[in-house]
Amino acid sequence: MFKLKSRRSNLLKFHRPKLQLNEAPIPVLKLESKQCIQNLLNYQPPKIRLQIPRSRCAAVLVALFVGRTGDLYVLLSRRASTLRTYAGDTSLPGGKWDAQDHSIEWTARREAFEEIGLPMDRQKVPLLCVVEPFLAGNQLVVIPVVVLILDNTLRPILNAPEVASLFSHPLISLLHSEPPFSTEPEMLEMKYHTYVDIAAHEGHVRMHRFLTGREAGGTKPIFGLTASILIRVAAIGYGREPDFEVFAPDQPSWEERLAHVLRHHLVFREAAQQEGIDPDKTAGSKTDDAHPGARRGRVRSKL
């Protein structure tokens, strides 16, 4: 669990799920999908003792739902072309923590409500789990919040200045290098899954890209942070690693990356100091999994 220096309730407290599978009105559900949901419900992220400044925290909502044939899909949005940053990108609903947010789950739900009109009702959209943090461009710490949409009658209400369109993608396809959809002749030379390794401190970070099958209509592939988050959620849910290499050979662990930005990046140092956190002290902290064998022995603890 994160330790944030404040007398207020812990912003990043991991909430316990309220969903019981045998009570939920889920449509026809494949055994594989049911096991995925159960695995997500049971997931306990590694404990972290890094002190992270709240002003550099953000959350995204990984909203899953059951499709007509019993498979699990994730909701994705196409960002408006008029946005100043990441215009037109494929993304998950989410945004920065607000001072009025009493938890990181609340941040994710609030942003999803504002962007796509997804109700904040935990009965209709119960929590499955909260996943360990990711770094977004060395500027923000992003925490994925995974939920399950039980009410299939819900209709999106898009915030046009922020969201151009909404679509879904099969979750399990984030574990495969082959496409889940039929490929058009003109796209045969385009691989469904590709990656590029970006230089980072003491190594590289692998950035994945997946086609959505909607590129002809202007939708961009699932790329970078969004792809990494969905790979992680799919691996937790389906209980197996992808059929491709997730990490670069020299990729630092996610706790090493967090410690590095807390100590060396100005935006994090200034934010930490403003919130009464010693960035040098917190950057020297360790997670429960930060032993010498953690990087290779437990690859799921990495970004």
Residue map of PLM features:
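Cofactor-binding loops of NAD(P)H-dependent oxidoreductases
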Residues: 169
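N-terminal leader/linker segments that precede catalytic domains of diphosphate-processing enzymes
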Residues: 1-163, 172, 177-180, 184-303
